[in-house]
Every structure is written in C-alpha cells, then in structure tokens.
Amino acid sequence: MKQVSIIGGTGSIGTQTLDVIAANPDRFQLVSFAFGKNIEVALPWLNRLRPELVAVLDETVKEQLEAVLDYSPTVLVGEDGLIAVATADQADIVITAVVGAVGLRPTLAAIEAGKSIGLANKETLVTAGHLVMKKAREKGVAILPVDSEHAAIFQCLNGERRQDVRQIILTASGGSFRDQTREQLANVTVEQALNHPNWSMGAKITIDSATMMNKGFEVIEAHWLFDVTYDEIDVVLHRESIIHSMVEFNDGAVMAQLGMPDMREPIQYALTYPSRLEIKGGERLNLKQIGRLNFAEASFERYPLLRLAFEAGRAGGSMPSVLNAANEQAVDRFLKGEISFLEIEASVEAALQAHENIEDPSLDQILESDRWARAFVASLSLAN
C-alpha cells in the first residue's frame, strides 16, 4: 500500500487526488494532509480518510477544525505545518497541489527527506527549477508530473533517449476566450473568464488558462523536467483537449498521449507509476464519437503572456520568479475587480521590465524577488 501526503488538499487537484485515494482503499492511504482554511471541503474527507497529521493556515482555523472533527489527529499551522506534512515519515509520495510559490519550501523539504514528488504545483519549477532539479538529482528523488501536459510528455518519453528528441509540443485549449479578439477582451468579466470550455479547475488556473500564462508556466516547467531548451518547445492550440501533448523525434515520428480531459488520469498515473490502474467511473476515449481533432497556431500577438514566459525562461535567474509572482498578484486583483482582464498582461510586463535580473539566485533571493514583484503589482496604478 502506498502512503500519500497532500499539500493543497481542498483545491481542484487536491480533491481529485482524494477521489483517487478513496476509490482505491486497498492501494493508497492518506497519512498527512495540508489545506488553508476551507473546512467545509476538508472536513468530510478528513473524517473519511483520517490522516494522522493535518496542517492548516493558522490557529483560528485549527481551533475551528478541531471543534468539528470526529477524530483527533495532530493539527499544525502555517509553513511549519506544510513542511511537516511534506516530510511525514510514513509518506512514500507527496502530491504538491497548493497554488503558487507557497509550495516551494515544502517541495524542497520533501525532496530533502527523500519523498517522491507528484508535482501539480508548477510554480515550484517556474520560480526555482534550478534548485529543485539539482536537489532531486542529489537525493535520487523522482519528480512525477501531475498536470496533464507534462504527464503526457513523461509517458511519450518513457524508454526514449534524450538525444533522439527534436521538440516537445505542448497543447493548449485556448481557454475561456479562445474565440474572441483582443478588442473583445477589453471588457470581459470575471464570471466569463472562469467559464473554461473543457476542464474543471480552480479560479486562478482558469484565469491563467484564459491568458495562456498557464501554458507559459508549462513551457518553463517542461524545460526543467525534460532537460530541453526553449527552442525545443512549441505550443499549439488544440481546442478539444484530447491530445494532451506530443513529442517529435529526430526521425520525424511524433508520439502523442490522448485521453478524455479528466485530471484523475494524470493524478492516478503519478500515484501508481510505473503501473497503471483503471479509473473507476472514468469516461473512455471514443475517437469515432469525437470525429475530428483541430489545431491552430498559439500566436504571441494574441497571447502576450506566452511570449513573456518564453522570454523570462530564456533570461533565467530571478525573472521566472518575478513572472510568476507578478501574475499571481495581477490575477488576484482581476478577481477582486480592481483591474481589467487585459491589465493582467500589462501588470506582468511592467514588473518584468522594472526588475533587475539576478542570474543565479539563492532560495532567499528567489523569495525576495517574489515579494518585490507582488508589492510592485499591488501598488501599480493602471488606467482602465
């Protein structure tokens, strides 16, 4: 039986991971669990799966949770709690599903403790890929991608030689506004932006999908996970989200991984690797019913944040950390109604232009760059 820890347990990836664990009680056991403050979502899962260690945002949430739990786990708070969950002695694998740069320290701690990582927190590699991959190599730790695109590439590369790879092709749905012009984007609402055509995801990642920032993060993540240059990564629009990504080899062969848009598939693959297990209640792919698959160019002109991600990735150093933090802050401001949809892009670009890159940043310098970018965007005054 595989022992599992989850960081970010009440978000979209976290709850779907819990679905997989609950559906396979003979294969998986939840030993530790971290979430912020969403007790309403966490409580039934905790009472059902009964992990011994729980971490929450602060003392207030701890008191509220302990008052309603029907068992008595150890409950910790704050970043120390996150790290305790990530390094729990019993855990074989840690699913890092927390959103944002807050996942960086717990992920590094889990690697240091020798835990396999099911990586759903792409910001960890975006902000500190050089530190994370170096530490993983030193500790002999497997980094298993949980997001659908990198899980697809991981499977396509299984058994292949790095020198035979010509390029990685990431597919993108195009997000909520894929059929709208940039002129039409000027006045879109938060509600419209959160209406993703294919995937059920959390609010931030749904906005990131609409701006293509999410795909930009995946470009940087692919660079670190698969040891490819940015010239060896391409992005193509694929509105059906059936082909999750592709790898082109030197002989012209292209290998693709297909499946229904169901996040339980890459989550379960990370948990069971190198084995496979039937997804209970999952919908099987029926190509005859789908009929056709469509592809189009992912234009930098249409999606400026994708361009900025390539630029920040190539620049390296502290630039990707600024890219991520500026975007997080800008998306938060958009969700609060403080800025328009297009001003997300303007905020991120302004932060990158204002930042003085640190070429080989330490962890502290990465976190300081993160803080600087958030403060910069929070104080930015933009004309609507």
Swiss-Prot record:
Mn(2+) binds at residues 147, 149, 218. One of its GO terms (molecular function) is manganese ion binding. NADPH binds at residues 10-13, 36-38, 121, 123, 202. It comes from the Bacteria. GO terms for biological process: isopentenyl diphosphate biosynthetic process, methylerythritol 4-phosphate pathway involved in terpenoid biosynthetic process. It catalyses: 2-C-methyl-D-erythritol 4-phosphate + NADP(+) = 1-deoxy-D-xylulose 5-phosphate + NADPH + H(+). 1-deoxy-D-xylulose 5-phosphate binds at residues 122, 148-149, 173, 196, 209, 214-215, 218. It holds the Pfam family DXPR_C. Its cofactor is Mg(2+); Mn(2+). It is an enzyme of class 1 (oxidoreductase). SUPFAM superfamilies: 1-deoxy-D-xylulose-5-phosphate reductoisomerase, C-terminal domain, Glyceraldehyde-3-phosphate dehydrogenase-like, C-terminal domain, NAD(P)-binding Rossmann-fold domains. Keywords: Isoprene biosynthesis, Manganese, Metal-binding, NADP, Oxidoreductase. Its EC number is 1.1.1.267. Disulfide bonds: none annotated. The keyword Iron does not apply. Pathway: Isoprenoid biosynthesis; isopentenyl diphosphate biosynthesis via DXP pathway; isopentenyl diphosphate from 1-deoxy-D-xylulose 5-phosphate: step 1/6. Belongs to the DXR family. PANTHER family: 1-DEOXY-D-XYLULOSE 5-PHOSPHATE REDUCTOISOMERASE (PTHR30525), 1-DEOXY-D-XYLULOSE 5-PHOSPHATE REDUCTOISOMERASE, CHLOROPLASTIC (PTHR30525:SF0). Catalyzes the NADPH-dependent rearrangement and reduction of 1-deoxy-D-xylulose-5-phosphate (DXP) to 2-C-methyl-D-erythritol 4-phosphate (MEP). HAMAP family: DXP_reductoisom. This is 1-deoxy-D-xylulose 5-phosphate reductoisomerase. It comes from Exiguobacterium sibiricum (strain DSM 17290 / CCUG 55495 / CIP 109462 / JCM 13490 / 255-15).
